[in-house]
A protein has these predicted regions:
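Left-handed beta-helix
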Residues: 1-163
Length: 163
């Protein structure tokens, strides 16, 4: 495990290494668990926290890979989401963070999810409260998570209908 509070800092202290602190004001979150990683991404959607991506004094520099802008098709619907370049939405996405080149097909529904780069969500698939890893394909009609559950689901491999 590589958790700062549970592993790295105690090991450094046991090894007699020097540790230094830096007082930081603003948003910070340890994302060492699935739940905290999901929460940090959902914080992007919450305008009432210290994480303000619209602040012109707090620039975020990233590698800008040439790609098409995101596209919401005629059957697509997006509510309260962050959408990265190259994403194509023909289904319905709500309260989610969609990374680059995500593809959500027609009649698919995504809610409170974090879809990492290159995720493909098949026609009629449903995703609830999940983190879907880079490059994963969710097959047509597959269901991930439950709208009635508080549990965060981590998907790191292809999901077929009925799994």
């Amino acid at each position: 495990s590589h958790d700062f509070g549970k592993d790295i800092i105690p090991t450094m202290l046991n090894d007699g290494k020097s540790l230094y602190a830096y007082k930081f004001k603003g948003y910070w979150k340890d994302v060492g668990t699935i739940d905290s990683l999901w929460e940090a991404n959902m914080d992007l959607l919450n305008k009432n926290n210290e994480l303000n991506l619209d602040d012109p004094n707090w620039k975020i520099y990233t590698e800008d890979i040439p790609t098409l802008p995101h596209y919401v098709g005629p059957t697509g619907k997006v509510e309260h989401c962050y959408i990265n370049q190259g994403a194509v939405i023909r289904g319905h996405a709500v309260d989610s963070v969609l990374f680059n080149n995500v593809d959500i097909d027609e009649d698919a529904f995504v809610s409170q999810a974090v879809l990492m780069p290159n995720v493909k969500v098949g026609k009629g698939a449903k995703i609830y409260r999940a983190i879907v890893a880079d490059g994963v394909k969710i097959d047509d009609g597959a269901v991930v998570g439950s709208p009635d559950s508080e549990e965060i689901v981590l998907i790191s491999k292809r999901v077929k209908k009925g799994e």
